[in-house]
Amino acid sequence: GYGAQMAEITVDTELGLLKINKITAAHDLGKTINPLLAEGQIEGGIAQGIGFALMEEYIPSKTENLHDYLIPSIGDVPEIESILIEKNDPEGPFGARGLGEHVLIPTAPAIMNALRNATGAIITKLPALPDRILEAIEISKNGSK
């Protein structure tokens, strides 16, 4: 399927903290068989994408458990507006398309594009941790290190 997402964020440029205020997600799922489950799938994929974008970093011997390897909780997930685009798929069951991984994929780019639009910062390594955000903001203001 096809999809697009937009993130609305607030950035604390002194601390490098990024807060997601809202994500708008439009996804083509063919014929929507169960709208409530489709919206839940979109919300879950976005939560995973937030983790990829801002939190989850595997460091051998340091982040090998869920105490040290951070994943999003309900407090990290912003308001989500889901737009279900329906265009029957002649190949899919009852005209439906799959709605899985392609929800996760555009989340990190949407957040990073919002960060760049707000601050000029270009993040080259995920997750976008506060120190990486501060460094990218500094580079955007003054050129390379």
Question: What do the PLM-derived regions correspond to, one by one?
Answer:
Residues G1-K145:
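C-terminal catalytic domains of large/alpha subunits in multi-subunit enzymes
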